[in-house]
Each structure stands twice: as structure tokens, then as C-alpha cells.
């Protein structure tokens, strides 16, 4: 089997309209007015693979696009006999149990857990697996009646035994379900799978990660306060009055009046920094850069004042995969240890980010 044998019609959703049009133009295909171009290309997939230009466009996006990606580290339990463990794992993967070079029929209606249905070899000790996984139900309303149906995701999993990682292209929750299922069989070969921290090379810092990327720009953050502080109504009012006093000073520059007002407030902070008190009662803090702002979030005053007292939960980073390339946006999940490509990206872009996080 080859890669074209495991492509399904829904994969064509990953291609943008421009990419669909490009393939149609390369192959000189004429469409009827009401014809679905993605259906037409799927029906002519053999024709696409006979044309190198069309095939390159297809393969750059067919499993990419707008995707959540989560990586896992493949760990051999003992440092001795690693090659033997790897050989055992290869034999396991290249077996009927892993649907190697075959496609297993899946009954979607009865599907309750991730189900591996095909696996092929991409390169030396590198494989691509596909899983069907149920992800809730959807309701269809036709204006008079409604019906519910099970929603199924078709997930791509890359297994690279040389670089020792799993790359699962779906949300963190489903990726973990798939990884756990693989772990159940991998552990028999003295192999374990662990979450890979996408910021491990950057000491957990979104700012350092951003700086490692071409044209990196820290555009947005969602954070949580480090301490769960509570204020009385009286102390809350005193804090508000303190801010008013500071504002007044910037207006009249009267330092004596400023000192008198501060002493009159007599706020008892019990050693807690003023900025940290301002975060009392907050569950999360979201900061976002204006579109016309040239400098990113890490250069903004408010972020730099707060960052000592908050922990980033997630962040948006804009970047390029080359010095003068197109700008893409990713959402980095520090709790989920995953990356969501908010822009429609190619395999080249996913590879660029992969090399940064492994």
C-alpha cells in the first residue's frame, strides 16, 4: 500500500479553495457548475498521483491544514538492548494487529473508542497510522424535525522510531486517548509513551519560544494568577482609591499631595505586592495586541508588570517558516502541551515547528 490508498474524501477539506483550484488547473479538469470540486478530485486521485506537480500540492496539505498537534516521546525502558526493543516494536507495527498495509472496515455506529484501521510505512522506521475516534454527537435540524448522529474524527498519527516520537494530529484529549491505547501494546516491548512538553527547550517560556521562530510575534496570552487572593469590600475600595491617587499625581505632579493621600489611605497589604492585590478575585487574564501595534505582547507595559504574578495558560504566536515567508498563527497550550495551527499550514510548516519542540 502507498499513501494514496489511505486518503479519504474528508481529507480534501484540509486543502484551501486556492489549492483545490491549483490542482484542477494543473490537471486541466473542467467542472460542471454544481459539481463538488473536492469530490471530483477524490474520484480522480490516481490521476493526481500521476502528475508530480499536482501530487506535491496535494501531499503538502492533505493531512495538514488547520490542525491541533500533540507530540509524545517514545521511551525505551532500559538503556541496554534498545535496538532489540526497536526491532520488536517494528515487528509489532508491521503486523495484522496494527492493520499494516491493509484497511480494516470500521462500524462507525458502534464505535465507542479509538480504533486503528490502517498503517503504512512512510520511510525508514517511520509509519503513518489512521484512527477513527468518536467525538460526541451532533444535532441536525431541518426546520421541522431533528435527528442526532455520532460525530467521528479520522485522525492521522505519525510514528517515527528513529527520532523517537509520536505525532498525533487532533485535540489534546483525543490524542491522549489514542496514545494510551498504543501504550497498552507498546509496553509489552518495554516501550513507554510520555507527553512531550512543547516548551521544554525554552524553560517553559512563550517569549523564548517566540524568539526562536522566524518573524516571531507574541500576539495574545491567557493567564491565571499565581495566588488565589481575596479582598474585603473595604480593601477593594482602598485599592481603587489608590489608583485614583496615582492618576491624580500624573496630572498635577504634586508629590506632597500624593504622599498625604497615600498615608491617608493606610492600606494594610500584609507584605503582598500592590500589583498582585490587583489580581485578587480574577480567574484568568487575557491580553491581546492591537492589530496596528508594531511591538508584540512581551514589549507591552501591562504584560511586563503582571507577568511576575501570573502563569501563562496559552498564547498566540505569529511566525513564518522562513525569513521572508507567509505569516501563520499558532495557539500554544501550556496545560495541554499541544499546538493548534490556527492558519491553514503545509507539511513544511508543521515540520518547522516539530523541529523546534522535539
PLM region spans:
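Intrinsically disordered, low-complexity, charge-rich terminal extensions
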Residues: 1-358
